[in-house]
Amino acid sequence: MQPTRRALLGYGALLACPSPTRADDLKDGRFRDEIVTILRGLYPAATISTDDDPEQVHVEAYTLYLGNLHGDLRGRSEAERQRRILAFLTRTMPGGPYPKDSPPPARTEPFAAARARLRIQLVPPDYATRTPDLVTRPFSKRLLVAYALDEPNRYQLITMPMLTAWGIEAGVLDEPARRNSEAEARQVSIEASPTGATGRFATSATEDGYAASRLLLPGFMERVRKALGTPGIIVAAPTREFIIAWTPDSEARARIAKVVRASFHKGPYSRSDELFHSDPAGLRPLTAAELADHGR
């Protein structure tokens, strides 16, 4: 699916128009909307959609992460912006986007090569509603486990047609995805502080799109428990970009639970307001009694 000649000729005028201040245009979605307009002209037959994340756009089988592109364009002339945007789209989707339900065999990366880029993800159920062939499994009432192919400028959630092209079952994805995610998580910082006279809390925030999914990583969660100094902790992932954990004896536990709910409703990148208990045996939802102890 190649860009139309008319579209390519027209983008000099589109990108040369005076642009508003770009201080917050990535976070408020204006930059994404600019890219969507360009994409619709370049690939008029492609299915292009957005969600509540202003830093990404879905183009057929691809999910493009726009943060790096936005940073690269800062301070550039309009002519240079045009050149770099078109170069980014060509590099990210060589040959153009392909439909979700029929990835061309010539472009299907062998699984032996792709497995090094597998990552584990946590996504809301509406992702599966929007893309019915997405490979998922239940995690909690509000979250599904999914799998992604990671790249600097995009990630691609794994779909059933991709499994068919690779000749594998969905169960094959989990082990390498967890292993790769654990390896990356070793470099992720965890900040811990007291919560008044009793208890401690910890946070871990990243902008790589995988902070919430680290709930699924035993090695990372062991680091969080060590930072809090106790074998059993409460943890939540209200948005994609951070997790928060605290000791069960924290005098601020009810207040923290309110912060979790508020962050989930405020977003962006909302994931879940659920509270989980983490210990060496694994992760589980809080019991009714534990929820009541947190004002729930």
Listing of model-derived features with the role each one plays in the protein:
Residues 50-55, 237-241:
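Short Gly/Ser/Thr- and Asp/Glu-enriched loop/turn motifs at secondary-structure junctions
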Residues 24, 28-32, 130-276, 284:
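A contiguous, surface-oriented mixed alpha/beta subdomain in the mid-to-C-terminal portion of proteins
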Residues 38, 55-200:
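Charged, alpha-helical interface segments at or near domain boundaries
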Residues 284-296:
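Short, low-order "capping/linker" segments at domain edges
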Residues 15-25:
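Bacterial Sec-dependent signal peptides at the C-terminal "C-region" and cleavage site
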Residues 24-50:
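N-terminal alpha-helical "arm" segments
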Residues 1-14:
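N-terminal secretory signal peptides and thylakoid transit peptides that target proteins
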